[in-house]
Amino acid sequence: MQAVSYFICIFVAQSMIEREMRMTVRFVLLWVLMTVGRGALAQQRIVMPAALKAGDTIAIVSPSSTPDSATVAKGCQTLREWGYVPVVGPHAMNSYHGFAGTADERAADMLWALRDSTVKAILCSRGGDGAVQVLTRIPLEEFRNHPKWVMGFSDATALHSAEVSAGVMSIHCSMCDGISMRGERDSVNAIHRCLLRGEFPTYKIPAHPLNQKGQAEGILVGGNLSVFCGLAGSEYDFLNRADEGLILFFEDTGEQMSKVDRMLHLLEIRGILSRVKGIVVGHFSKYKSPESGFADMYEMLHEYLRHYDIPVCYDFPIGHHSGYNYPFVEGCRVNLTVGQGGGGILQFLRPLRM
């Protein structure tokens, strides 16, 4: 009797093990299929807004601080010279505790610009502070359902992060003041105009002694370091796409070197620096470095980035007070090639319309 019970127990145990193994295999297969599926969908999710034509309307909105009326007027005149029709948002010139209206008013302008079918692109009037307040009032589906070029930089990085998170490309570029400048910026503004027509650029990367050699291809995201680090882990954080293979770019102004150090450490402990395929370091201006021990901001950044076997270029002309601030297409696939201590190429790979 004991022998029979023993064999029954063995049989039951084997059956349970086989069942568990089958369930485990099924789970693993399902996980693999879901992961592969997510990866395929993720690469297809980012769409390119339609190119603009002469006579198209561009909305000017103020999601951040209150703009100067003369600067907005110059921006409107420049857009007219480019062949477009500028329309200033209903609340774009408002003032409320330094912001261009309440958060609800600023969000209302963004929603109007996204939903109005006659508006083909959206230009932020200026940076400053406050764009993050607008995000919680704009469902990500609004960006996805109304794919339009959102243009700006600095505090507008929050909008770029949200739009790319929703699966739509945007343009990191100068705003009303920058596009109105003449002289040495004419070539930059010419590139901006080409982007709006759907013509993507290839940039030469300047030589820098700290540049790290390498070649990589990935989805370009970035902007103001302080702004996108402040969105860490939220649904508006484009770095949630890190597993898709990103080329990260960042710049900042007026920050203490110790604060930038903490932000780089945040990217490191989140595993972002170990997963990005390449990095473009833009201009850092008016930073403070009390007793840092580093010669400059780039030397401090290099202390972090030198440990990663990826292409890195420094002092690319993008960001505050860079003199040029070349436009970047966020969410676009790019090819980054950098020589050790030398220059290189950043090529935007124009996607097929989806």
Where do the protein language model's features map onto the residues?
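Internal helical hairpin/lid segments
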Residues: 239-297
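Short Gly/Thr/Asp-enriched flexible loops that form oxyanion-binding sites at enzyme active sites
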Residues: 127-144
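ATP/NTP phosphate-donor binding region
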Residues: 42-118
